[in-house]
Amino acid sequence: MKQILLLLTAFFISCTVSVPHNAPVTTIAKGVDILQQDYEISKGGERLPTKLFIFDVTLSNRISLKATTADDSNTAICSSHERNTAIAPISKQLEMMQRNNKQIKVLGGVNSDFFHIKSSNMICGVMYRNGECLKGSYDDQSTIFALLKNGTAVCVTSAEYEAMDKSLILEAVSGRQMLVNDNVAQSSESKTFHPRTAVGVTKDGKRVFILVADGRRKGYSNGLSYADMVTIFKKLGAYDALNLDGGGSSCFSINTGRGQFAPLNRPSDKSGERAVPNGIAVIYRR
């Protein structure tokens, strides 16, 4: 984990669009670090702050990832608009997962899928839990983050997903824009800055970086552009990375003890944590 801090430090020193203020690293389990970073971004000629939160996860027999749902059940996810998909804040989803699974310790997690927030709350992409496909359809822009049964993780395009052996998938959630694909930075015409949630993996699939950036609070944090995320994931060492649901959905929640969870970041909605359909949990197998 020290290597990643050195990489980040070198990046922040050399970067022309971001200036570091601190880079605290907290180890919450062997193989799981939380990195926090203060940035300054250049936006419209102004230098503005942005705060980052990153889970640096080395997958192993003990450390893994699980897809979350509103009530920790597969039936919470609906594959059509015929009924509403259940939603809950990520912290509540993690609490429910912890309550129902005493054989694991839930360390924290983030939101994941884009969803139909103005109608049925149906997620826009595919989702798997415990090897079961809960939703197999996806929209044209979908990308997929998956944990495979061999313990490695992948970020893939929809075309790459179609070519996969689906029986190998253990957990999966979906995003949209690919940020890095086969070690190649992906360009975007969008120059807007928003709160962000994103995930990246190393080439061997054994290391996962889960990023949340706060935004929409000028005096506190102003978000990231796609180009910023590309640069960050490349410097982290991601071979593939993709963008998850951001904006008011972006939440980086951690275990605060006694089965309780709370955001380490500051979600941008005035009401606090937004209720969402699903997320990614970082877990320790006891």
Regions found by a protein language model. Give the residues of each.
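Structural recognition of the beta-strand scaffold that forms the well-ordered cores
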Residues: 107-111, 144-146, 154-155, 200, ...
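Sec-dependent N-terminal signal peptides
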Residues: 4-13
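Conserved beta-alpha junction segments in alpha/beta enzyme cores
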Residues: 40-43, 48-56, 174-205
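Zymogen propeptides
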Residues: 16-138, 143
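Conserved, well-ordered active-site substructure
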Residues: 119-138, 188-203, 207-240, 249-286
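Beta-strand-turn-beta hairpins that frame and shape the catalytic cleft
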Residues: 59-63, 151-152, 200-209
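Active-site-adjacent helix-turn-beta-strand microarchitecture at beta-sheet edges
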Residues: 110-191
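Short, solvent-exposed aromatic-acidic interface loops
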Residues: 69-76, 159-164, 212-218
